[in-house]
């Protein structure tokens, strides 16, 4: 990895992102060497202080590692910039994920069918841009909600999917085990969401869920295992959607709503979820 990137790394171990800054942040400031680490997820993470390694240089290091990560089937290479001094380091909102390009997804089928697919927040990073007509990165829940407000106020000339990720719950409050901050963020989102809900018409399908848990009251700093919420506003509501067998059910529901085939090409059985609309 050092040969590919042309730099020497610190770390090269499995650690929590916050812990490794405590352990190696001061040495990074002294040597200028980026910190390389991994975690329980399928990731390579590169941390660097923004005053030591400029953002574009950090991103370029991650781009170079993406080829190696593809070969080893590693899901993401994550740039983890931070600021601050020893004892008070803080990760910034300039994180950037370089993900493995996924196989065909419902997003690709929507785009091919003429549906405008817009990713807000980390969605462009997660899907490596695949199947997205437009990617709108954001740095906070507030910016994500403001972007949604702007998009919902528009009158598009074709069907549109808005796919938004609100990162603060996970990044700022889950991993950092800040239950008070998590609660405030939930209240803020609930206020925003509640005021927008009456404005959604019968031609709009709304789905809210999460890709994993991150209990801010649990020990450690990693993701936690619990059932995630699944809320829908659309035809046949209200009713209990029950506990689903697969995230693919969300994709199947979106595919049915837009009138496309969710099954994909031959052999992609992973797309064959069960629509909530059925």
Regions found by a protein language model. Give the residues of each.
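Feature captures the catalytic ectodomains and active-site-proximal regions of enzymes
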Residues: 1-278
């Amino acid at each position: 990895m050092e040969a590919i990137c042309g730099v020497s790394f610190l770390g090269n171990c499995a650690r929590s992102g916050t812990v490794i800054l405590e352990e190696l942040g001061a040495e990074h400031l002294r040597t200028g060497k980026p910190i390389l680490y991994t975690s329980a997820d399928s990731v390579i993470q590169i941390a660097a202080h923004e005053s030591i390694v400029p953002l574009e240089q950090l991103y370029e290091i991650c781009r170079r590692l993406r080829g190696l990560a593809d070969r080893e089937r590693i899901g993401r290479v994550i740039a983890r910039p931070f600021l601050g001094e020893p004892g008070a380091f803080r990760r910034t909102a300039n994180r950037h994920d370089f993900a493995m390009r996924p196989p065909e997804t419902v997003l690709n089928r929507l785009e091919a069918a003429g549906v405008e697919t817009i990713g807000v927040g980390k969605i462009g990073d997660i899907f490596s841009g695949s199947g997205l007509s437009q990617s709108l990165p954001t740095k906070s829940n507030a910016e994500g909600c403001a972007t949604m407000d702007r998009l919902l106020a528009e009158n598009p000339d074709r069907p549109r999917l808005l796919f938004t990720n609100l990162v603060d719950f996970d990044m700022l409050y889950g991993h950092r085990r800040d239950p008070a901050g998590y609660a405030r963020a939930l209240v803020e989102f609930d206020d925003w969401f509640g005021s927008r809900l009456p404005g959604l018409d019968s031609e709009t399908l709304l789905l809210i869920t999460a890709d994993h848990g991150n209990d801010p009251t649990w020990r450690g700093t990693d993701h936690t295992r619990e059932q995630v919420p699944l809320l829908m506003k659309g035809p046949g509501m209200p009713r209990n959607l029950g506990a689903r067998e697969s995230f693919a059910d969300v994709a199947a529901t979106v595919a049915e709503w837009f009138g496309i085939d969710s099954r994909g090409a031959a052999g992609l059985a992973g797309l064959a979820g069960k629509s909530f609309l059925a």
